[in-house]
A protein has these predicted regions:
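Short linear, low-complexity motifs centered on an aromatic residue
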Residues: 199, 206-207
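A contiguous pocket-lining binding segment that forms or flanks enzyme active sites
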Residues: 140-199
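A general structural motif
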Residues: 116-124, 147-151
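Short glycine-cluster motifs
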Residues: 125-129
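Active-site catalytic pocket residues across diverse enzymes, especially alpha/beta-hydrolases
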Residues: 106, 130, 160, 164
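Short, acidic/turn-prone active-site loops that include or flank metal/cofactor-
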Residues: 115-118, 172-175, 202
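Active-site acidic carboxylates
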Residues: 2-117, 132-137, 183-190, 207-208, ...
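Short acidic-hydrophobic, aromatic-tinged amphipathic segments that line or gate anion-handling sites
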Residues: 111-114, 195-201
Length: 253
């Protein structure tokens, strides 16, 4: 006779539980506050992902991996309907055009073309666009990626932290000329209070529950750009004979 206990399967009606302690009480107790990014409170910035600049990135095993992370992040924003702002710097010269996939994914979005100011947050036109988006949506969690982590990502991150934003740099959707640049930038941003994230983990944090209606739309970034979990999804889909499984947990009566 088997002594194996029966698995406990949570009800499919379960919803996400918030922390038991309020943010104010956690702060007063000296604890960290988990003020996480969500599709409802976030804005996503793509800074200077231009083909000329991307060609100089040296801290990835391949530029294909780097490009895949950037486009995976973009597809995540698209799937979850997170507002985005895209900026470029001197695109008419050596920096080159914005990555084609970004332009295709966000075909309805303008590109804010800076003409010399390196820190996008210090550019009056771009900051005006961001502040307008913040005021009209009441979103103050800024998810940020930049072509170079030491400049395009770090500089606006430090500026926005000073102005009271919650900033989440997506460090594997940023490149660097060297490992030293990446290490210095990561240390600098973390020390200033930024919450560093990665493309895959951020996508999971934003989705939060695979029972949410956005789950189907979130398949695209995982299948196309985040194979670490995309392979798992494909395996399930194939084993299910490529049709939806009505009762994957076997709990419906």
């Amino acid at each position: 006779m088997s002594t194996k206990p029966t698995d406990v399967v949570s009800p499919i009606s379960d919803e996400i539980l918030p922390p038991k302690v309020s943010a104010a009480d956690a702060l007063s107790a000296g604890r960290a506050v988990y003020d996480k990014p969500t599709p409802e409170n976030s804005i996503m910035l793509f800074i200077d992902h231009q083909v000329g600049l991307m060609s100089g990135v040296r801290d990835f095993s391949s530029l294909a991996e780097y490009k895949s992370n950037v486009t995976g992040l973009a597809r995540t924003a698209k799937a979850l309907k997170i507002p985005v702002l895209i900026s470029s710097s001197n695109a008419q010269w050596q920096n080159g055009d914005t990555l084609l996939e970004l332009k295709e994914i966000f075909a309805a979005e303008p590109i804010y073309r800076r003409t010399g100011i390196i820190n996008c947050y210090e550019d009056p036109t771009f900051r005006q666009a961001l502040e307008h988006l913040v005021s009209t949506t009441n979103r103050r969690h800024i998810i940020l990626s930049g072509v170079t982590i030491g400049t395009c990502c770090t500089f606006p991150t430090l500026s926005m932290l000073q102005d009271g934003y919650k900033v989440f740099p997506v460090i594997d959707a940023c490149g660097a000329w060297s490992a030293y640049e990446a290490q210095a930038a990561i240390s600098r941003m973390a020390s200033a209070g930024a919450e560093l994230v990665t493309t895959f983990a951020l996508a999971c944090e934003l989705q939060a529950d695979w029972k949410r209606p956005t789950a189907n739309d979130m398949l695209a970034p995982f299948l196309q750009n985040l194979p670490e979990y995309g392979f798992v999804l494909q395996n399930f889909w194939n084993n299910a004979n490529q049709h939806a499984v009505k009762d994957p947990f076997g709990i419906l009566k």
